[in-house]
Structure formats: C-alpha cells, structure tokens
Amino acid sequence: MQTRKTLMATASLAIMACLTGSVSAQNGGARSASPAAAPAGTILPYQSPPRHLIYIATPGDEGADGQSGVVVLDADHDYRFVKRIPYGLAASELPGPKISGMTSSIPANKIYVTTDGGSMIAFDLKTDKIAWTFKGETGPVKLQRRGAAADGCCERPYTLPGGKTLLVASAYNNWWYLIDAQTGAKLGRIETPETPHTHNVAVTADGKLALLASISGPKEGAAGVAVVDLPNKKVLRYITFSDDVRPITINHDGSLVYANVNNLDGFEIADTKTGKMIKRVELPGEMWKAKWADPNAHHFVHGLPSHGIGMTPDESEIWVTDAANDAWQIWDNPGDGRNPVYNPSKTVPIRPGINSSWISMTNDGKTAFVGDGSIIDVRAHRVIGIMKDEYGRPIQAAEKVLAMTFRDGKLVETSNQFAIGDAKAREARLEHETGTRQASNSGN
C-alpha cells in the first residue's frame, strides 16, 4: 500500500508539472506555450489528460527472459502493463536480435530502436506501426564485432536538440550517422578514426558539443572519447582513459565527462576542454577487488565491475552500478564536479544475481529505471517497484528505457536513455543551497 501511495503521489506531481508546460531537452528546456483564453461561449474541443508512459525496448543483453518488442508501462497507475509493440518478426525469428539503443522525437512523434541485426526501426507513436527502417552501408563494413551486422548499423542513437535529427552510432566502427528523424534519410556522417568502436554518446542541451564514446583504450593504442563540434561535424580532440571506455555521462555544459572503464568498480573523470583525464574514482578496494580477481565466484554482466553510470539532473549525485555487491553506489558531487565524495549511506541494493547494468532517469530527476528492472525513488534512495510484463514477469537487462508524456496521442515530453546533468536543474539547486546558507548565517 505504501508503494502504491508513493507511486501515485509521484504521478500526480508529474501531471501537475505537465499541465504547466512540457519540458524536454529537444526544445531547449523551454516551456510549451499556455493555451490562449477562449472567448465566452466557445465550445472547446476535448483534450485528454496527460499520460505518463515508460517504454522499454527488449531484448537486452543476456536476454534470458525471452522478451521481444517494446514493452509499455503506465507510470500513472503503479507501472502496470499497457501494451507490447512488436517488431514485425515471424515466430521463427523471435525474440529477434539484441536491442542496442532507443531514442525518441517530439516533432516527429516517433521512437527509434536500434538493433544488432543491422537496422534502426522508427515507430509512429500515433499508430505504433513501423514508419521506416534504416539500414547502414550497402556493402560489408570493416568490423563486425559481437555478431553485429555487416552493414555497420547500429549502436546507441541520440536525438539532437530540436528533435529533427538523430545522431546514431555505427555498430562498433569509426563513424556516426546523422539521420532525418521524420524520413530516415541519411544526412551525413561524422568520422572518428581514433575512436574505432562507436558505442555510447551524450550531447549538450544546446547541441554544440557531442561526446562520442568508443569501446577502446590505450591497450590498442586508441582513444576512448571523441569531443566533437557538432554544428561543424568536426572532432576537436580525443580523450584517452586508463582502459576501454564503457557507459558515460556528462555535466550540464559537457565540460566534464564521467566514464565507466574496464577493470574498475567506479569511474574516471575527464576535462573535455583539455582532453585530459583528471581523476580516477574507485569504490574502496576491500568491497570489490577480491570478487573481481575471481570471476568464477561472481557474475559480471558486460565483463566489468561497473557498467552503468548516471548523474541526477541537478548534478548533486553520481550513481554507479556495483556488480560486485548487487547495488547502486552513490557519490555526492559538490562544487565544480571534479571531486565526488563516496556516500555509503545512500547505497541502493538491487535484486541479487541480476546485474543492474544501466540507469535512466525522468527529466525531473525523481525516478530512476535501472538494468535489473528496478524502479527507484532517487531522493529516497529506495527501490519502489519492478518493471514487469503482461504476465507479471520482471523485465531483465532493461537498458533501453524512455519516460514519455503524451496528450491526445502526441508526444509532448521525453527523457533520453542517458542520465546527464541539466543546466536549469543545477542552477536551481545552487540557488537553493545559497539561500539555505544565507538563512542559516542570518539565524546565527
């Protein structure tokens, strides 16, 4: 009963926020215009209340749960099952290739699902039908890692500010596609020769800077992240971390990138203006090193201790998955974000034996969705639910999750699959902290 009250309260707050205007990175954080007052006696058309839905693209990595399609849950009603959107596969093809990423576009009213099978599929959110499918190259590409398709498509996609263009990673090769969100037409490519295995991505809210991550590092003489001037499609510099780069997050202006790397329970921080790694942040060794030294004693999804990192929108906390202890570990993030402080009192245990290998958050930073299927109250640091399918089965390897708001079948707000810093949320937090200090000082 307590969980239900918590969820309903969260949903009510979200509805109130939506009624005052939707906020999305795709419209630069601007609030949508309030409807003009109608003349007296005017009969207004019916407008449905906003709906808050969670879209989960399956199957994920190590998809032993046999899921297929995009599972939709109702965030306004205890995350109950709403629908499963199929990929149009024959029975003999199910569950289909692993899903490598998902993003959405407000103006196009579409979601986009990338697959290891060599395609990116666009779904019309008004009909839930396939609108178009993008295939990569016409001939075999150089690298076909982990069974990725010979056409070089596709890894994680990212919707650029404005919602009209998609930035899409090739499947572990050294270029990124620019795709028209409405039509699926290829608009161009960004070449990143020193980061040879494209994988994860984050973009600043103004669309000026992109951090393009590659599963690569010094062991193969390669960098891990390309810092790109997005309007000019130009690589500004490359960043090399201590090992191969895996999931990443960025602060509000992209001046800092935080990266999971192989062989580390924790993360590393780099300054994107200098291209230098500035700090290695590690969980206390006694908590993980013995388990990592004996992988037969513990299962590590993706083959590393930490595959999952996110930042609250206000940048007050950095969340990192800890596969060695079946938990999310949290670092407080004071000041300029260069010196996080581990806070064991905030640790969030998750389902044992099912590694939680990703994190996404709602735009308001109140709710997190993590890889083992857990739904977490971010402020309380507590699991409040589990993502489940139509049969009540927990969804595992939930690494491609979007929290979206609809009105009359039209997408009006969306999160993205990465949990990154937000300038307005950070500014509001800093103002609040300043006001609190001033009030405290005046009281003394």
Please report, for each region that a protein language model flagged, where it lies by residue.
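Gram-negative bacterial Sec-dependent N-terminal signal peptides
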Residues: 3-23
